[in-house]
From Swiss-Prot:
Miscellaneous notes: 5 rat isozymes encoded by different genes have been described. ACSL6 corresponds to isozyme 2 (ACS2).
UniProt KW Transcription keyword: no
Tissues expressing the protein: Predominantly expressed in the brain, and to a much lesser extent, in lung, adrenal gland, kidney, small intestine, and adipose tissue but not detected in heart or liver.
Family: Belongs to the ATP-dependent AMP-binding enzyme family.
Reactions it catalyzes: a long-chain fatty acid + ATP + CoA = a long-chain fatty acyl-CoA + AMP + diphosphate; (5Z,8Z,11Z,14Z)-eicosatetraenoate + ATP + CoA = (5Z,8Z,11Z,14Z)-eicosatetraenoyl-CoA + AMP + diphosphate; a medium-chain fatty acid + ATP + CoA = a medium-chain fatty acyl-CoA + AMP + diphosphate; 15-hydroxy-(5Z,8Z,11Z,13E)-eicosatetraenoate + ATP + CoA = 15-hydroxy-(5Z,8Z,11Z,13E)-eicosatetraenoyl-CoA + AMP + diphosphate
Main location: mitochondrion
CDD domains, alphabetized: LC_FACS_euk1
InterPro entries according to UniProt: AMP-binding_CS, AMP-dep_synth/lig_dom, ANL_N_sf
Side Cytoplasmic, residues: 42-720
Protein name (Swiss-Prot/TrEMBL): Fatty acid CoA ligase Acsl3
Length: 720
């Protein structure tokens, strides 16, 4: 079974090769500078050390199955952000009145776009972007009001569904606010979904209107419009595409600007609209789904408000000075919740994309600035995949440094790790060693929030140290409106997801098959159940699945059965230690946690991604591996192998060489012998949401991966 061990600073240090005398001298200089420059801090240092160790949550009773609550909500769970603001339109109205002329949504103008031919012959589009252009709270309110009224003029009815299938951008949020105001039920679909999944979502929700972009209309929607018979109006947020002849009769394409103009021209008496109730559906959010077809989760106004109330309480000093960079899919509950938290607190939201995020991003022309360099955000959300990439890229740069530079970086890294464990800061290291790393994300980040999947302890510690800011790891599901837990910003422990938010409570349910019990010693363990106002209404048109995953207790409180296995630390913080669906019983009876195997190996420089696989008909684990091209090519060179990238990945000799590296790392990570992959398949192609092999949060889609690699599974298990 999964015996989780928290990483300690001493076990996570980087190796250094510096002369002891020089090491002592540098330590002396750093310590002297720190003391002389930050003496006032040292008077407060003791209280800083105590904070991470205080009790953050505790059970509400002495029973083993008792729910844990934040110490700040023992007398009752929070459900409202501002008094009287019990629906999302009221929250936005409150924010609009308070921050009326303040900047809210920002977008960069495209100054130039050109094709750039790569050495391998591929053509990449590169852009040069200008400064951010901003809309104020008042601007956004007026545009949303006009858009909602225009949709009403097109026949959109209150409590009827309307879909949005669009990239993350200002128009997405404007459209969402319009729907919240007019009580239209917003159906959200990931921009990376494939045709069958899009058709399923649109037909299941019976939408007649859809909001999209010109690019998605041309590349994805136009091929499936004929399969959505109820569709009548397509609204593009960024102008009309050039051709219209291919659309079925009865389908009309409008621009967002035209619909807003229609709303402005309407008679005054027609501008009245139905106000939502707290219990009304605000969003039907289709999950990208790590298993099966996407499911629509029904999320009410009260669900979202409870969720953002809990999240906002975990971000200190949240307010008008903050700038948030929005680039994750707004169809993901993490991004939507984060942006609504910011909107309700006067923060600016500048829009970006994974392709334009940093100076080195794939669409940014060399020599021009990425979005973080221009926006200089203070707040940012990320999924572990993105943080892992940053970690690997920086460490690759460190390995390419001169011996002196590399040792200086490692010395500063290890020194800061020790100081963090004591609750102290390292101003000299931050100013002179880590400044350039911080600049990768603009230089002003003060809080990084990670969610969507587990974050490795190594990556979390790296981000803490090199970006000189806390990394809040959160845990939540679409079914809990993204809310569950978030670590407190001064808690630098790794491998945990924090205490329950003030909007919810969490308890652990025994799982006998897996051997997890809430009476376990030294800490209670079991399946995580989340209860509170943030727990959603269930799955759209799927009563059986709703009954399986949700229930109400004797007090009428709604609970979600997550399928994740957790463990509570003595201070009330939760660890995610397993997942019921990831646990496989081998032929000989041993249980293997596939997620545990992947977590132990995925941060190797040689590995870009890995999926472990096993079944009960065989006695060993196998794996599918996306290798890092630079690292694998170098490994092949040192072993005397030549060939193209595809030839290296298809080489049984290279499979064996990579397997040796994995086995050594697995032993170092204390994996059991039966947990170590015995055979692997190297994949020359990366797994992206577009391939359908991972979700938009880059979680593995095990069913799709199994289908994709079925021939390799049979080969590795010896079947013809």
């Amino acid at each position: 079974m999964n015996n989780h061990v928290s990483s300690t600073p001493s076990t996570m240090k980087l190796k250094q090769t510096i002369h002891p005398i020089l090491l002592y001298f540098i330590h002396f200089i750093i310590s002297l500078y720190t003391i002389l420059t930050y003496i006032p801090f040292y008077f407060l240092c003791e209280s800083k050390q105590e904070k991470p160790n205080h009790i953050k949550a505790k059970p509400v009773s002495s029973k083993p199955d008792s729910a844990y609550r934040s110490v700040n909500s023992m007398d009752g769970l929070a459900s409202v952000l501002y008094p009287g603001c019990d629906t999302l339109d009221k929250v936005f109205m409150y924010a609009k009145n308070k921050f009326k002329d303040k900047r809210l949504l920002g977008t960069r103008e495209i100054l130039n776009e050109e094709d750039e031919i790569q050495p391998n012959g591929k053509v990449f589009k590169k852009v040069i972007l200008g400064h951010y252009n901003w809309l104020s709270y008042e601007d956004v309110f007026i545009r949303a009001l006009d858009f909602g009224n225009g949709l009403q003029m097109l026949g959109q009815k209150p409590k009827a569904n309307i879909a949005i299938f669009c990239e993350t951008r200002a128009e997405w949020m404007i459209a969402a606010q319009a729907c919240f105001m007019y009580n239209f039920q917003l159906v959200t679909l990931y921009a990376t979904l494939g045709g069958p999944a899009i058709v399923h979502g649109l037909n299941e929700t019976e939408v007649t209107n859809i909001i999209t972009s010109k690019e998605l209309l041309q590349t994805k929607l136009k091929d499936i419009v004929s399969l959505v018979p109820r569709l009548r109006h397509i609204i593009t947020v960024d102008g009309k595409p050039p051709t219209w002849s291919e659309f079925p009769k009865g389908v009309i394409v409008h621009t967002m600007a035209a619909v807003q103009a229609l709303g402005v021209k309407a008679d005054v008496d027609k501008k009245a609209h139905s106000k939502p109730l707290p219990s009304d559906i605000a969003v039907i959010m289709y999950t990208s789904g790590s298993t099966g077809i996407p499911k629509g989760v029904m999320i009410s106004h009260s669900n979202i408000i409870a969720s953002i109330t809990g999240m906002a309480r975990r971000i200190p000093r949240l307010g008008e000075e903050d700038v948030y960079i929005g680039y994750l899919p707004l169809a993901h509950v993490l991004e939507l919740s984060a942006e609504l938290v910011c909107l309700s607190h006067g923060c600016r939201i500048g829009y970006s994309s994974p392709q334009t995020l940093a100076d080195q991003s794939s669409k940014i022309k060399k020599g021009s600035k990425g979005d973080t360099s221009v926006l200089k955000p203070t707040l940012m959300a990320a999924v572990p995949e993105i943080m892992d990439r940053i970690y690997k890229n920086v460490m690759n740069k460190v390995n390419e440094m001169s011996a002196f530079q590399r040792n200086l970086f490692i010395l500063a890294y290890n020194y800061k790790m020790e100081q963090i464990s004591k609750g102290c800061s390292t101003p000299l290291c931050d100013r002179f060693v880590f400044r350039n790393v911080r600049r990768l994300l603009g230089g002003n980040i003060r809080v990084l929030l990670c969610g969507g999947a587990p974050l490795s302890a190594t990556t979390q510690r790296f981000m803490n140290i090199c970006f000189c800011c806390p990394v809040g790891q959160g845990y939540g599901l679409t079914e809990s409106t993204g809310a569950g837990t978030i670590t407190e910003v001064w808690d630098y422990n790794t491998g945990r997801v924090g205490a329950p938010l003030v909007c919810c409570e969490i308890k652990l349910k025994n799982w006998e098959e897996g051997g997890y019990f809430n009476t376990d010693k030294p800490h209670p363990r079991g399946e995580i159940l989340i209860g509170g106002q943030n727990v959603t209404m269930g799955y759209y048109k799927n009563e059986a699945k709703t009954k399986a995953d949700f229930f109400e207790d004797e007090n009428g409180q709604r609970w979600l059965c997550t399928g994740d296995i957790g463990e509570f630390d003595p201070d009330g913080c939760l660890k995610i230690i397993d997942r019921k669906k990831d646990l496989v019983k081998l032929q000989a009876g041993e249980y293997v946690s596939l997620g545990k195997v992947e977590a132990a190996l995925k941060n190797l420089p040689l590995i870009d991604n890995i999926c472990a696989y096993a079944n009960s008909y065989h006695s060993y684990v196998i794996g599918f591996v996306v290798p890092n091209q630079k690292e694998l090519t170098e490994l092949a060179r040192t072993k005397g192998f030549n060939g193209t990238w595809e030839e290296l990945c298809n080489s049984s000799e290279m499979e064996n060489e990579v397997l040796k590296v994995l086995s050594e790392a697995a032993i170092s990570a204390s994996l059991e012998k039966f947990e170590i992959p015995l055979k692997i398949r190297l994949s020359p192609d990366p797994w992206t949401p577009e391939t359908g092999l991972v979700t938009d949060a880059f979680k593995l889609k095990r069913k799709e991966l199994k289908t994709h690699y079925q021939a390799d599974i049979e080969r590795m298990y010896g079947r013809k």
